[in-house]
């Protein structure tokens, strides 16, 4: 399920892109890159993230924004958070791939808090959804109770309004434009009826 999401998201990466991967599921996309020159950025101050380290080669001083140990590629650079967010807010990130708790039919994103639950803060997502040239959200289509996370309107506090360009779930791929949500692709083995049944949001079919 998660593997299908990650592999599909990796297809959106293009040669020479500067890409920010959100915490959690999006970080796994870096492991799918092969033979392309993609520069991954992390908002804690790193440009040039590599794949996850192999056992026995972990450097505890190298971590991403989610505090996971990582590797770096030749030519990687390190800098402070002010410079990192200047890159993001200045429009220098070609693509941000973020996780999501809810996405609405007009491209609103909620991914930073659940009311009454302890959180560390909003992180860099609010800057990324407005600074990156393209925003892709990857997430499971339904929550653990089987309820759709693809909503008519988000019920959780918003990260950004109308900021999502593309949504990739374990069931389908959607694109957003002109305040409309369009189904453009089904995941392997998934039917249109399954997507309709599991989706609260209204969408156009553009298969």
UniProtKB/Swiss-Prot annotation:
Q: What is its EC number?
A: 2.8.3.5
Keyword terms, alphabetized: Transferase
| Entry annotation: catalytic residues | 43
Q: Using the record for this protein, list the coiled-coil segments as residue ranges, or answer none.
A: none
Superkingdom of this entry's organism?
A: Bacteria
Pfam families under this entry? Answer: CoA_trans
**What molecular function terms (GO) are annotated for this protein?**
CoA-transferase activity; succinyl-CoA:3-oxo-acid CoA-transferase activity
Q: Which reaction does it catalyse?
A: a 3-oxo acid + succinyl-CoA = a 3-oxoacyl-CoA + succinate
Oligomeric state and interaction partners are given as: Heterodimer of a subunit A and a subunit B.
Q: Which NCBIfam families match?
A: pcaJ_scoB_fam
The Swiss-Prot or TrEMBL record describes its family as follows: Belongs to the 3-oxoacid CoA-transferase subunit B family.
PANTHER family the UniProt entry points to: KETOACID-COENZYME A TRANSFERASE, SUCCINYL-COA:3-KETOACID COENZYME A TRANSFERASE SUBUNIT B-RELATED
* Protein name per the record: Succinyl-CoA:3-ketoacid coenzyme A transferase subunit B
